[in-house]
Amino acid sequence: MENYNDILEKMLNGEIKPYQLDKMFGSKIATEIRRKFIEKKVGIEFKHICNYSIDEEMAMKKNIENMIGAIQIPLGFAGPLKINGEYAKGEFYIPLATTEGALVASVNRGCSIITKCGGATVRVIDDKMTRAPCLKTKSVVDAIKVRDWIRENFERIKEVAESTTRHGKLIKIEPILIVGRNLYPRFVFKTGDAMGMNMVTIATEKACNFIEGELKKEGIFVKTVAVSGNACVDKKPSGMNLINGRGKSIVAEVFLTEKEVNKYLKTTSQAIAEVNRLKNYIGSAISNSMGFNAHYANIIGAIFLATGQDEAHIVEGSLGITMAEVEDDGLYFSVTLPDVPIGTVGGGTRVETQKECLEMLGCYGDNKALKFAEIVGAAVLAGELSLLGALAAGHLGKAHQELGR
């Protein structure tokens, strides 16, 4: 880097703000100067975050502010995993970015077992993105009038909302919750291959402005307090999303004969079903958890980081129910994930390393989101089967010990 000591001095003196460098220099130089600024501020020398291959200019336009470098997370793969989906058909290698030792090995074992047993059957049972603003009125009487007006004028609201986007389609506005004199209408959209949060926020905001204006003509006061009123529910664990779904809602299942359970998991169907009942149902219930599963978040998190999804949505992907049912001749095993917000275009999917991981799955770009969702569901199934099998067989501690974790 050239000598920019005068710029650094002005930054240290507060004369130049770090974000102002983007307009003064190109993206690469601005990033380097900010990095030097932090080094001087905290008294360390960066040796690793300065080494990366992603395009700073593109990242700074779309993904990050005050950029000083990039971090690296170890990337492995699990597979092949045979998937019998509606959109994902065949064998896939699953990219997993994680610093948790033994995770990839566990998912890989699950992939191997599922593939040997005929593959995972996967379906996306629902597909939507939601935004629920908070609307304030003068009384509960007015709140009811606003609720009824929204329902009666849905088609007009739909036209206004959809005028902001080429891809978003407003499907419904339900439920419309009333608390005191406030309303929380849940706008439900189809968003194509984008995860869609920005899309639905912009559309909902315009719809709210329309609602305010039209009701003002009728002498009813209504004010949008916040375009997101937390009934969406975005980036938080939620009973609303567990029941009603958000993003992609996915079910993945596999059937193993008793012989296959004995051979590959070194345990019995009955033992796995008991672990699932006492751990995932009873244990989750007494702790008031909404994740009736062993570790969906592990697989969701590793895939999200690898493929450029919004990492804050990992908490939503952690919701769901694992089923392990003993049949006469074996084990029916399934995972139900009601809330997986994902996309194959936009956001972090543009970042070069994340784009390559989506390409590894054949899932980058348009018309790929449902295929990607089925792959995610199958990968979670693999991770869940492997862990519950290890717990039932009493092998979990041994596995971590052998892998030196």
UniProtKB/Swiss-Prot annotation:
One of its GO terms (molecular function) is hydroxymethylglutaryl-CoA reductase (NADPH) activity. InterPro entries: HMG_CoA_Rdtase, HMG_CoA_Rdtase_cat_sf, HMG_CoA_Rdtase_CS, HMG_CoA_Rdtase_eu_arc, HMG_CoA_Rdtase_NAD(P)-bd_sf, HMG_CoA_Rdtase_sub-bd_dom_sf. Its EC number is 1.1.1.34. It is an enzyme of class 1 (oxidoreductase). SUPFAM superfamilies: NAD-binding domain of HMG-CoA reductase, Substrate-binding domain of HMG-CoA reductase. One of its GO terms (biological process) is isoprenoid biosynthetic process. It comes from the Archaea. It catalyses: (R)-mevalonate + 2 NADP(+) + CoA = (3S)-3-hydroxy-3-methylglutaryl-CoA + 2 NADPH + 2 H(+). Pathway: Metabolic intermediate biosynthesis; (R)-mevalonate biosynthesis; (R)-mevalonate from acetyl-CoA: step 3/3. Pfam families: HMG-CoA_red (PF00368). Keywords: Isoprene biosynthesis, NADP, Oxidoreductase. The active site is at 100 (charge relay system), 310 (charge relay system), 400 (proton donor). Disulfide bonds: none annotated. Converts HMG-CoA to mevalonate. PANTHER family: 3-HYDROXY-3-METHYLGLUTARYL-COENZYME A REDUCTASE. Belongs to the HMG-CoA reductase family. This is 3-hydroxy-3-methylglutaryl-coenzyme A reductase. It comes from Methanocaldococcus jannaschii (strain ATCC 43067 / DSM 2661 / JAL-1 / JCM 10045 / NBRC 100440) (Methanococcus jannaschii).
